[in-house]
A protein has these predicted regions:
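Membrane-embedded helix-loop-helix hairpins and adjacent transmembrane boundary segments
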Residues: 1-485
Length: 485
């Protein structure tokens, strides 16, 4: 049995489980079930599901792959993620529950007006569509190499089939189903990583007791970087950026907040947020350990491109190498598709919700049957759009996947973060019709700053802190729009 058919069989079995769970949990779902899970989701299941939703295929492939060049510097940002999650839990979640929002961008309409509301919704649409497509693109490339290319199928067929499968299990139940399917994905993801770590360690003749010291002794396991403020890996850059990254991409993201707000009340939602964030630190640590083991095992036999190691290809190359049993390759595929399909499925649901509620405002017509028809048509439209974006990115991509995702988030989530910061910190009203102008100009200013930072600021490199700068520029722009009493 060839590798391609083994992978296909693995995917088919995995999707069979997803379809069964989705059908059981979502067969009676109405619009409230799709959008909010009827506010009845158990907080501990949401916490487990949140892990699967926040860890995408990019994390699964690129975090271990980035260890060679960046060591464990990513953990500095992950620690910031935890602090950011505390802020989301204590500040944003109670506010969203008090306002009883279906879409969190309804806050912008209440605070500023319709122009700001639509601006936030459109920025989320662009952010999530491009971000989710980039994440899923990474997985499609791996599946194309292992399955579709050996079978003579073009990349476009790969993308259409995989997105269609995601649409099939998510279109009926929405959040009500995703909470349970994503919990399965989280379980598969963790089991996959643990199995790979254990087997690779065994191949290196490392027992469980020897593994910590071997990892600590390797040069790739350095976590903290305090020596050079100009370095993109500098601790305070990554830690502070991680705080604001989570506030923007979790607390102000309809995707992850949609499942968080499906809990019964804000207390349970807070528990979910804090617990899932704590567990995520441990799981990211597993990915980093896996990265060190992969490079220890590969030695000098790293996949290369233009004379440089290709980090994103290391995990797949090792998992499917001749010296490893098929079981490890299968676990790699299970973990990969669990991470990827979880993120893509929840993104489609969130995009459908925001576009239907925020942009089309179909929920305000008072016709539930019409709302259902609109929601289902939008869901199809979001799927088609994602297919198109992935294919375009396939022909344009020339950057490391994880940096592309976070750079994208810094540009598109910055204005959303800025609007919420201004709205919460200042009670003054602004000229709502000019808010879209500020939110478009701000990322353009930040792009110019980032491209010229080393030349203008004595070698200083703007990296992940770009999100903070973008938000601050947006806040300054909104201050200029304050109405005079």
């Amino acid at each position: 049995m060839t590798t391609a058919w083994i992978v296909l069989a693995t995917i088919a079995f995995y999707f069979l489980l997803l379809f069964i769970i989705s059908w059981i949990t979502g067969r009676k779902a109405d619009n409230a079930g799709f959008f909010t899970g009827n506010r009845k989701s158990p907080w501990y299941m949401v916490a487990i599901a949140m892990i699967g939703a926040s860890i995408s295929g990019v994390t699964f492939i690129s975090v271990p792959g980035a260890v060679y060049a960046g060591s464990y510097s990513y953990m500095q940002m992950v620690l910031g993620f935890f602090v950011g999650s505390l802020i989301v839990a204590l500040v944003l979640i109670p506010m969203f529950y008090k306002m009883n929002l279906v879409s969190i961008y309804g806050y912008l309409e209440n605070r500023f007006g319709a122009g700001s509301y639509k601006t936030g919704a459109w920025f989320f649409f662009v952010s999530k569509m491009l971000g989710a497509s980039v994440r899923f693109f990474v997985v499609c490339v791996v599946l194309h190499t292992l399955v579709f290319e050996p079978l003579g199928m073009p990349f476009e067929v790969n993308v259409v089939l995989t997105v269609a499968l995601i649409w099939l299990y998510s279109f009926q139940g929405g959040v009500k189903s995703l909470i349970w399917t994503d919990s399965l994905k989280t379980f598969c993801l963790v089991i996959s990583v643990v199995c790979c770590i254990v087997y690779i360690a065994k191949s290196l003749n490392l027992g469980i007791g020897e593994l910590p010291s071997a990892i600590a002794a390797d040069h790739t396991s350095r976590i903290f970087f305090f020596d050079d403020p100009n370095d993109g890996k500098y601790f305070w850059k990554q830690f502070i950026a991680g705080i604001f990254m989570v506030i923007a991409t979790t607390g102000l993201d309809q995707d992850l907040m949609q499942r968080t707000l499906s809990c019964k009340n804000y207390r349970e939602s807070q528990k979910n947020m804090i617990v899932s964030s704590g567990i995520q630190i441990f799981i990211i640590g597993l990915f980093l350990v896996l990265g060190t083991l992969l490079y220890m095992y590969s030695g000098d036999n790293l996949p290369m491109k233009d004379g440089k190691p290709v980090g994103d290809a290391v995990f797949g190359n090792v998992a499917w190498s001749d010296g490893f049993p098929i079981f490890i390759g299968v676990m790699f595929i299970i973990g990969l598709i669990a991470a990827a399909y979880s993120a893509a499925g929840s993104a489609l649901t969130a995009l459908t919700t925001s576009f239907t509620v925020d942009i089309l405002q179909a929920d305000k017509h008072g016709d539930d049957a019409r709302l259902t028809r609109t929601r289902k048509m939008v869901h199809v439209g979001m799927s088609v759009c994602m297919v198109a974006v992935i294919i375009v990115f396939y022909y344009l991509n020339n950057d490391s996947a994880i940096n592309a995702v976070y750079s994208l988030a810094a540009y598109t989530y910055g204005p959303i973060l800025g609007m919420f910061i201004f709205g919460l910190a200042c009670r003054r009203k602004v000229r709502d019709r000019l808010v879209p102008v500020v939110c478009v100009v701000s990322p353009l200013i930040c792009f110019v700053l980032q491209q010229n930072s080393e030349q203008w600021f004595g070698g200083y490199q703007i990296s992940f802190e770009l999100l903070i700068i973008n938000a601050l520029v947006t806040v300054l722009g909104l201050c200029m729009l304050i109405k005079k009493d």
